[in-house]
Each structure stands twice: as structure tokens, then as C-alpha cells.
Regions:
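Intrinsic low-complexity, intrinsically disordered or marginally ordered coil/linker segments
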Residues: 1-245, 255, 270-277
Length: 277
């Protein structure tokens, strides 16, 4: 399974143009607020290909296509999908025409990520869309979208579930990156940004604080330990982390945990930076 990347896309500019863009990128599903295929469509010829590509003879290809046309597939193939082989000649032509001979390589080259967007959150007509992608943020897909709407600004903030790593922010306008910020993995800035992005959905912390008690306690203790790392004390990060934990524990009425967190907060002199207040 891949690492899931949380992406928060904000589209700004002329309201009429923003709404036009939102209507174009919306997928077929009720909760599919962004579908990369609507503005950066993968060629039909690459659908259901294999990665790495499977080269077969022309005879095998004809037999394969006949099976597909007649729906003569095994139960496993019907359930999990049928991966098509292609001929050597097709592979060469696809590379020349599309730059890739299979879906995976094409996605990476044109979307910047393995799959289409999933686990999406937004409201109808809202200019902010939160969604997940596999392994990486879809920089190339959003770059293509921004080139189609040159008067709009597309800002993306993203964070890996590998907390504090593969996290950053960029803005694209008219197909060009006008702003970028990728803090060093594991740094205070990266951890702050990741907590802010994941916290927008009460995702990263609440999953652990609200579900399995043992996992929740282990996670709380690990963050407390992280908060007290010497290198973070001068940055105000300890209290930033612990106050967030306290807020979530109070919401879940976990009062014993609240008391434990308060004890750790009081034991350290570090204060929240003025910009956190």
C-alpha cells in the first residue's frame, strides 16, 4: 500500500472563472470534486495496461481482445480488473505518441502521482478541495490545470502520512510555479506544517486519540517525547504539540490524559511563539 498524501487545493481569482473551473474538474461521482482525467486525460489506449508493460504477440493480443469483447474473463479478472498486454509495435507507438506505454508511467509523467485523487472533501461550489493521492502530490496535474486557467491561482498544501516528511506548499499560475516551500523532513517547520494540514481534518491525531487505547497512549507518549527534544525547545514546538493534544483529549473527555498532558506542559518553560498566539 502507498503512503497517502493529504492535499489541500485552494483556487482563487475571479469568482465566475473559479466556478467554471470547479465545474470542469468535477468527476462523475457525488463526492468526486476533482478528477484529473477531466483536464489531463490519460489516452484510452493505455487503460488497463500493465506496469511494467507486458509484451505479447499479435496473435495473443487478438485472443486477449476477443476475450474482453465477449466478457470471457475469470472471476478474479472480473473482480480485480484485467491487465492488458500489448505488442512490441504498440509499445513503440505509444511511447512515441504518449511518452509512455503503460498507465503507471503515464500517470507519473503527467499527473506526478500514481493514481487519481481519492478520499475527497469539499462543499458544492467551495473553492477549497481536500483530497488524497498516492506517494506524492499531483504537481504535474495541477500545473496542467493552471495553464488552462491562466487568470486563476492554484495553491496546494500537502503532507505525507509519514508525519513531518514529504510536506510542503506550492502555488501555480498560468502553468508556472510562483511560490514553493518544502521544509527539511523532520524539521520543526515540517512538523508544524504537517500538523496544521492534517489537523484541518482532525485526522492524524484524532485517529490515535479516539480509537485503540493502547495505540493512542503510545502515540501521545511519542509526541510528548518529541515535544521535549532539546533541539525543539527554543522553537516553541513543545507547547504547540502538547496544547493540540490537550485540546483533542478534552474533546474526547479523556480527562486522565488531559491531566497527564498538563503536567508535561507545566514542567517545561518553553512558550508558544508569538505568531502561534
Amino acid at each position: 500500500m502507498p503512503n497517502h498524501i493529504t492535499n489541500i487545493l485552494t483556487i482563487t481569482g475571479d469568482e465566475q472563472e473559479v466556478q467554471k473551473c470547479l465545474a470542469e474538474i468535477k468527476g462523475q461521482g457525488e463526492d468526486q470534486f476533482i478528477d484529473f482525467n477531466t483536464f489531463a486525460p490519460m489516452p484510452k489506449e493505455l487503460e488497463n495496461t500493465q506496469s511494467p508493460v507486458k509484451i505479447i504477440s499479435q496473435k495473443e493480443y487478438d485472443e486477449q481482445e476477443a476475450r474482453i469483447a465477449n466478457n470471457d474473463l475469470t472471476d478474479i479478472e472480473k473482480q480485480w480488473g484485467f491487465s492488458r498486454g500489448i505488442t512490441k509495435e504498440m509499445s513503440k507507438r505509444f511511447k512515441e505518441e504518449f511518452g509512455a506505454d503503460n498507465w503507471y508511467d503515464w500517470h507519473l509523467a503527467n499527473w506526478g502521482t500514481k493514481w487519481n485523487a481519492y478520499d475527497q472533501i469539499s462543499e458544492e461550489g467551495d473553492n477549497v478541495i481536500t483530497f488524497d493521492t498516492a506517494w506524492s502530490t499531483p504537481f504535474d496535474a495541477i500545473q496542467t490545470l493552471s495553464a488552462k486557467y491562466p487568470t486563476l491561482s492554484f495553491n496546494v498544501r500537502y503532507a505525507d502520512e509519514d508525519f513531518g516528511h514529504n510536506v510542503g506548499e506550492y502555488t501555480l499560475e498560468d502553468g508556472e510555479e510562483t511560490y514553493g516551500n518544502v521544509p527539511d523532513g523532520g524539521s520543526v517547520d515540517a512538523l508544524r506544517m504537517a500538523m496544521d494540514i492534517k489537523g484541518n481534518e482532525d485526522y492524524y491525531l484524532t485517529d490515535y486519540l479516539s480509537n485503540d487505547a493502547d495505540e493512542g497512549e503510545n502515540f501521545t507518549n511519542s509526541l510528548i517525547q518529541l515535544a521535549h527534544e532539546k533541539e525543539f525547545l527554543e522553537e516553541g514546538y513543545p507547547v504547540f504539540v502538547l496544547e493540540k493534544l490537550k485540546e483533542l483529549a478534552l474533546a474526547d473527555e479523556q480527562f486522565e490524559r488531559v491531566a497527564e498532558i498538563e503536567k508535561h506542559i507545566e514542567s517545561k518553560p518553553a512558550e508558544i511563539d508569538e505568531d502561534e498566539e
